[in-house]
């Protein structure tokens, strides 16, 4: 079991992040969790983006197999740690390049947060030099593994220091937020995950995890995505989108 994925215990025990509404420098420097939706979504055209984080851990073939069998595209955010640990999983993704795009989740799964501390028990980068290494080394790993340069970066834990975000963009990466957190770090039961995904509205950028094959949440990811397909949803990959195709929320 990957200690870096969230569990119910870590969610309850983790120190609260400083509220952004507080005045002063502490609030300005508080980590933020950027939201993102698809820009061209309309009520009469159901379209969503499925994004799956491959943090340190294993390969959830239950999810990947279901996507392949149903012809549903997805964006995979992989760490260098995951790529090295899961050559068979990577091979499956590369065998279906029409469905899967592999993007940058960092080298060592270090949150791009400045200063001391942890988020959900994970030590943060601390400074911009470490942020730059995490992002660029992660990108180099993706390029070496897939032959394609990633365009998007998603932080470990999904949190960023505001001062780190323009530096990541300066390195040439879009910051991949999301609007629907489906599995809370692969910690939720299958029924809850399926219900969250099935209730998605048009334009959602969904985040779930594909690195925890021994947890029940993965079955919920499959069930929820299949429910969206039955609703007639179209699925898009982030690498097929331009800067004007997504909007912050």
Where are these regions (language model features)?
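N-terminal pre-catalytic segment of deacetylase/amide-hydrolase enzymes
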Residues: 1-50, 56-65, 69, 90-91, ...
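Metal-dependent polysaccharide deacetylase catalytic core of the NodB/CE4 family, i.e.
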Residues: 46-47, 68-191, 200-208
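Short glycine-enriched loops at secondary-structure junctions
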Residues: 53-57, 106-109
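Alpha-helix N-cap/loop-to-helix initiation residues
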Residues: 56-57, 82-83, 161, 213-217
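Generic recognition of short, well-ordered alpha-helical segments
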Residues: 61-62, 88, 163-166, 219-223
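Charged helix-capping and loop-helix junction motifs
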Residues: 190-193, 220-221
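Short amphipathic alpha-helix with an adjacent loop that forms part of the alpha/beta core around
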Residues: 196-198
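Catalytic grooves of carbohydrate-active enzymes
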Residues: 201-239
């Amino acid at each position: 079991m990957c200690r870096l994925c969230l569990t119910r215990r870590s969610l309850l025990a983790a120190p609260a992040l400083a509220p952004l509404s507080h005045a002063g420098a502490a609030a300005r420097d508080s980590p933020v969790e950027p939201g993102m939706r698809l820009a061209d979504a309309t009520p009469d055209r159901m379209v969503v983006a499925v994004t799956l984080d491959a943090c340190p851990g294993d390969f959830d073939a239950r999810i990947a197999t279901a996507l392949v069998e149903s012809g549903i595209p997805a964006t995979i955010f992989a760490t260098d740690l995951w790529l090295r640990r899961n050559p068979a999983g990577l091979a499956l993704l590369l065998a279906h390049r029409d469905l899967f795009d592999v993007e940058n989740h960092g080298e060592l799964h270090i949150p791009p947060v400045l200063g001391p501390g942890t988020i959900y028990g994970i030590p943060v980068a601390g400074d911009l030099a470490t942020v730059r290494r995490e992002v660029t080394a992660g990108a180099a790993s993706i390029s070496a593994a897939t032959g394609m340069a990633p365009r998007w970066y998603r932080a470990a834990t999904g949190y960023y220091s505001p001062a780190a975000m323009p530096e990541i963009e300066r390195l040439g990466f879009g910051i991949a937020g999301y609007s629907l957190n489906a599995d809370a770090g692969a910690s939720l039961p299958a029924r809850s995950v399926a219900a969250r995904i099935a209730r998605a509205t048009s334009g959602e950028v969904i985040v779930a995890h594909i690195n925890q094959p021994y947890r029940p949440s993965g079955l919920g990811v499959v069930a929820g995505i299949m429910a969206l397909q039955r609703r007639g949803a179209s699925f898009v990959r982030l690498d097929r989108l331009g800067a004007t195709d997504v909007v912050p929320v």
